[in-house]
């Protein structure tokens, strides 16, 4: 039996009633990714022959959310873990081994599974744990020699068996040559009326096949999620581990307990991240980047020596070197900032290229635009890029000075060194070095009397 032929079955069909959610349990997220997606990633890292994911409750949602190249198998009736694996049998090879994982055990890692597979060899591998509280979990039963003889679910256990602290995590390695016969011989004559996968341990022992237990090195690696409390506990463990890795790599986290990474973070040296920041997707931070408190950054690249002030939101954007962003700034998708750009409070930029040294220090909207170098936006500048049907582009040259409270109505082009007077609405192109004024002349009415209410 070739030991290198590996099938993986991931059980993900349960209802998750204790989550009190319309969303299938396995789609609830850890670190920004659905739990079952994390398990698939871990499984794929083992380079198996195939991965079968058994789904049932909310299968349409699972398929719509987790778009992965795996074998999807439907369990139409939830009749237990043994029945779930049986539904995957047609997709498993006749020889080799099958590793059984769970879509609601999101933190299982490659190292643990490789250890289990090595220990199992061509026989049976069983991942166990000794938690502080084994209540509700299946107990590992051993004989006088310490060999595993069975797993007894708590509802079927007697007082002596319930006193056992070692529990079954559910993760198993099974020989394919025996798997079909063992599954076909399962009985549902138990307290749950289900076909228990755990009953295969006793069948292996009866067939003279050794069971190799491996105790997980940390309980959270094999911990399942049945409710929102357990979900948040694993989320915090996951985030703590990520924070520790960043600290070891030289990133300064002002408070590791108030840091969330929901993706991948690539960083240079001397990066500083303040409290309550959330990072999603793929993030790249250059040398000496500082992220202020309460920022949300998603799929962004930030160049060296740039400072992001508190309460700023950056999504799908590129920020050059030596930028000053925020506080309360928003960079939306396709915002592309060159070096030495200043974006101040309550400035929003979307689908726009901003040239080197340009400043928009406050209360400005820049959308669908191309802006040159060393241009300055006065407070309250708005680029009106949408006519109700289509978006239009605005082009602004180098060293342009846009007065406060101006509206640039796209499509429009401002040449180099153009100046616009405060309060202007610019609707036509302006050539280089010109001053554009587009506002009503002020009128002062002499002798005007302010009306007052009648006093009665």
Swiss-Prot record:
The active site is at residue 362. Pfam families: Hexapep, NTP_transf_3. Residues 1-228 are annotated as: Pyrophosphorylase. GO terms for molecular function: glucosamine-1-phosphate N-acetyltransferase activity; magnesium ion binding; UDP-N-acetylglucosamine diphosphorylase activity. Pathway: Nucleotide-sugar biosynthesis; UDP-N-acetyl-alpha-D-glucosamine biosynthesis; N-acetyl-alpha-D-glucosamine 1-phosphate from alpha-D-glucosamine 6-phosphate (route II): step 2/2; Nucleotide-sugar biosynthesis; UDP-N-acetyl-alpha-D-glucosamine biosynthesis; UDP-N-acetyl-alpha-D-glucosamine from N-acetyl-alpha-D-glucosamine 1-phosphate: step 1/1; Bacterial outer membrane biogenesis; LPS lipid A biosynthesis. Binds 1 Mg(2+) ion per subunit. It catalyses: alpha-D-glucosamine 1-phosphate + acetyl-CoA = N-acetyl-alpha-D-glucosamine 1-phosphate + CoA + H(+); N-acetyl-alpha-D-glucosamine 1-phosphate + UTP + H(+) = UDP-N-acetyl-alpha-D-glucosamine + diphosphate. In the N-terminal section; belongs to the N-acetylglucosamine-1-phosphate uridyltransferase family. Homotrimer. This is Bifunctional protein GlmU.
């Amino acid at each position: 039996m070739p030991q290198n032929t590996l099938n993986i079955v991931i059980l993900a069909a349960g209802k998750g009633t204790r989550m009190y959610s319309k969303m299938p349990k396995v789609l609830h997220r850890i670190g920004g990714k659905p739990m079952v997606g994390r398990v698939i990633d871990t499984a794929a890292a083992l380079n198996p022959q195939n991965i079968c994911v058994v789904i049932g409750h909310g299968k349409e949602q699972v398929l719509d959310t987790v778009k992965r190249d795996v074998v999807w198998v439907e369990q139409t009736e939830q009749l237990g873990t043994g029945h779930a694996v049986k539904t995957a049998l047609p997709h498993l090879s006749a020889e080799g081994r099958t590793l059984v994982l769970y879509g609601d055990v999101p933190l299982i890692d490659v190292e643990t599974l490789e250890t289990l597979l090595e220990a199992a060899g061509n026989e049976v591998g069983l991942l166990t744990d000794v938690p502080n509280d084994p209540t509700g979990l299946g107990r590992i039963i051993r004989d006088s020699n310490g060999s595993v003889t069975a797993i007894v679910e708590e509802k079927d256990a007697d007082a002596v068996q319930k006193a056992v602290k070692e529990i079954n995590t559910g993760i198993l390695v099974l020989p394919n040559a025996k798997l079909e016969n063992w599954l076909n011989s399962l009985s549902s004559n138990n307290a749950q009326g289900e076909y228990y996968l755990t009953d295969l341990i006793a069948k292996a022992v009866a067939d003279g096949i050794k069971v190799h237990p491996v105790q997980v090195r940390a309980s959270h690696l094999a911990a399942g999620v049945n409710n929102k409390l357990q979900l948040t506990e694993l989320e915090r463990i996951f985030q703590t581990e990520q924070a520790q890795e960043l600290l070891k790599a030289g990133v300064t986290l002002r408070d590791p307990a108030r840091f969330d990474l929901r993706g991948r973070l690539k960083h240079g040296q001397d990066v500083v991240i303040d409290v309550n920041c959330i990072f999603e997707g793929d993030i790249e931070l250059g040398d000496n980047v500082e992220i202020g408190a309460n920022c949300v950054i998603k799929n962004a690249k930030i160049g060296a020596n740039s400072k992001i002030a508190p309460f700023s939101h950056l999504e799908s954007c590129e920020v050059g070197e030596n930028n000053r962003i925020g506080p309360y700034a928003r960079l939306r998708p396709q915002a592309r900032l060159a070096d030495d750009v200043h974006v101040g409070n309550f400035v929003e930029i979307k689908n726009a290229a901003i040239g080197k040294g340009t400043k928009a220090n406050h209360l400005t909207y820049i959308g669908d635009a191309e802006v040159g170098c060393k241009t300055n936006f006065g407070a309250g500048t708005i680029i009106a890029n949408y006519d109700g049907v289509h978006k239009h582009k605005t082009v602004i040259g180098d060293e342009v000075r846009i007065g406060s409270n101006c509206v640039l109505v796209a499509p429009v082009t401002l040449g180099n060194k153009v100046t616009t007077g405060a309060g202007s609405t610019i609707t036509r192109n302006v050539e280089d070095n010109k001053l554009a004024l587009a506002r009503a002349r002020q009128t002062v009415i002499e002798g005007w009397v302010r009306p007052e209410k009648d006093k009665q």
